[in-house]
């Protein structure tokens, strides 16, 4: 599959198109064919090195797509369903706490600048049925930003 890697040192000139094997989902994971990804200021800050990440990180925190494969132990998701990634996939409930804020796609873990992503199923939610993939891909970071502004 095609992916974009961020090489070191970080910088827009060091975003590189590459080929990488698609990983099969393991326990509790799903594989999603990415149909759309949206660019946020957060993604720009990662790309220029303002948020440090590992060499060859796949950027982009937000994405939408179709479930292609479901790993063992996954309940509540099926192949063919449309989903979006969650900005804080480890924050399932309750108030914000530091340990829930890790795992952000595109900086703590690989993100959505790829044809396929394999991630824990808990890091996804279904898309609104009336939204296009492009519309759905904008929800995670933007909705969280709006929520933070209200809180």
Residue positions per predicted region:
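Conserved hydrophobic/aromatic beta-strand scaffold that supports enzyme active sites
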Residues: 17-22, 64-66, 116-118, 124
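Extreme N-terminal starter segment of soluble prokaryotic enzymes
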Residues: 1-2
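Glycine-rich beta-strand-centered segment in the early N-terminal region that forms part
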Residues: 22-37, 47-92, 128-131
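Short Gly/Pro-enriched turn/cap motifs at secondary-structure boundaries
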Residues: 21-22, 55-61, 104-109, 114-115
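NAD(P)H dinucleotide-binding glycine-rich loop of Rossmann-like/cofactor-binding domains
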Residues: 87-151
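Short N-terminal binding/cap micro-motifs at the start of the first secondary-structure element
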Residues: 10-17, 41-43
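Alpha-helix/helix-capping structural signal
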Residues: 37-39, 72, 122, 144
């Amino acid at each position: 599959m095609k992916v974009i890697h961020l090489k070191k040192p970080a910088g827009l000139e060091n975003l590189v198109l590459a080929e990488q094997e698609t990983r099969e989902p393991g326990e509790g994971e799903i594989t999603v064919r990415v149909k759309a990804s949206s660019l946020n200021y957060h993604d720009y800050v990662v790309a220029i090195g303002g948020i440090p990440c590992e060499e060859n990180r796949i950027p982009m925190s937000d994405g939408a797509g179709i479930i292609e494969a479901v790993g063992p132990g996954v309940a509540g998701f099926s192949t063919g369903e449309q989903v979006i990634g969650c900005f804080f996939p480890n924050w399932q409930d309750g108030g914000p706490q530091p340990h829930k804020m890790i795992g952000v796609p595109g900086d703590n873990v690989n993100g959505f600048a790829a044809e396929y992503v394999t991630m824990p199923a808990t890091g996804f939610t279904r898309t609104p049925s009336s939204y296009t993939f492009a519309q759905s891909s904008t929800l995670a970071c933007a909705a969280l930003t709006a929520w933070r502004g209200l809180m």
